[in-house]
């Protein structure tokens, strides 16, 4: 399976990065719907798709409004959007409100109401059901992270959150093959990260170490304060199997 990081940035797009959206095309799994959502035009087809939203901040959901452009020249299968009740309410009632974007796409919204694991039938030939475990994160307005197990592979997706919240999800993400984790700030910005509901790149490495993750992919990169070479080398020394994601990165899982 291949993981495509379509957008690797946070907060707002820049000349280098669009905001978060990733896809595993083989299983129809989409992670968040930031400004990079338009890049799904290379993948969407008539099979079913599942979008998992972490929260309703615009850098994670604005791409949901791009549906009509993505479907103008192709037939697209049913799209199910998963998220907390609060996130889905914000998407339906605010993002798609009459003054902002009055034409709701034919998404099927399914609220996640507990942190218990559940399985999804992907309705794709040759695909086993996918196990999903939602985990609570610490971010203004609330957020969810996820662990996905499918086809003998495990992926954790954790953004946006603080280091203190890691105790709530470390057990769930133990020994994952790939940990996709935000790092909105370089080292030295720990106080700012805590205040805004984020982590630094050093803290993300600590989480990966504690979880026993095999690989760490850093996303939600700050569009204003990027990581310098010393910080990149420092994180690699702490956790060698790390990639600081760039847009359109492809990772074999």
Q: Residue locations for each model-derived region?
A:
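Binuclear metal-dependent hydrolase catalytic cores
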Residues: 1-157, 164-170, 230-253
